[in-house]
Amino acid sequence: MTLPGRARAVDPSEAELAVVIVNYNAGDYLRRCLASLEARRGDISVDVLVIDNASRDGSHEAAVAAHPAVRLLANPDNRGLSAAWNQGIRATTSPYVLFLNPDAELWRGTLAEYVQVAREHPSAGIVGPLVRNPDGTVYPSGRVLPGLRDAVGHAFLGGFAPGNRFTQRYHMDGWDRTTEREVDWVSGASMLLPRKVFDAVGVFDESFFLYAEELDMATRLRGAGWRVLFTPRVEVIHEIGVSTGRSRRMLVMHSTSVYRYYRKHRAPGWRRLTLPLAWSALRLRAELEWVRERARRR
């Protein structure tokens, strides 16, 4: 439902940019996310829409109360990220749509500059910013699609030996991310898409409940001739894991979504010959990550 009585800074039908934030028990991070958008809007009209997937912590109500220009759609159940993103697409009309995690904050640059980058690169179906961890280090958003060898190597070694050559290739570690360049995909924590791409390839695949939905969209867009662009002109800080958690269930869900992606996009021969190996590697990685997470909490 749409909560009535919210003051709006701009008519949503006239906004140049729509920002879609899917919330699920994000606590005070959502309020901070919204505050960063207000502080770094720039000279652009913005329609901010929070879609809540049945949070129990009241974060959506408290955050929107503090930011009355924000619209709220409150779902009675958790519909998953892709389905909620699609709700946001249907509920907005702006020519550009920014999908932003509730545990992410715009840190450098403005929303206006984000859109300007997209306008300067009309062939870009996705624009992603430089993403930083809370300690200021650079998170490797903007990656290549790994081949089977690198995917399995990263799955086995990435959590314990991040300097291994498989992970280095996957993360494009030889690039310092100070330059704008085309990549295979960017993190869904923050990505801007021109609305016209949804007419070209459709909306997000709702069979991806959580994880790999941005990877799937990037692959579909690149297959249709669009580019995926990384830009350092905008920076986002992302508190990874607040929106999703690091439970064993979430780690297994991540592996399941990645498996679903490879099953969907790889050729029949690849599926027939190597998919069981990839699935085993992904599940083993989930178990190893869970062991590491439990050890970290002690």
Give the ranges of each region predicted by the language model.
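A conserved acidic beta->alpha catalytic loop
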Residues: S36, D52-H60, D77
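Short, acidic, metal-binding catalytic loop of nucleotide-sugar glycosyltransferases
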Residues: A35-S45
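Non-catalytic, C-terminal membrane-associated alpha-helical segments of glycosyltransferases
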Residues: R246-R298
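Glycine-rich, basic loop-to-helix element that forms the pyrophosphate-binding segment
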Residues: A74-T92, P102, E113
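A short, conserved alpha-helix in the catalytic core of glycosyltransferases
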Residues: D176-E235
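Short aromatic/hydrophobic "clamp" motif used to bind/position activated sugar donors
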Residues: V97
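Short, flexible, basic/aromatic active-site loop/helix in glycosyltransferases
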Residues: P146-V183
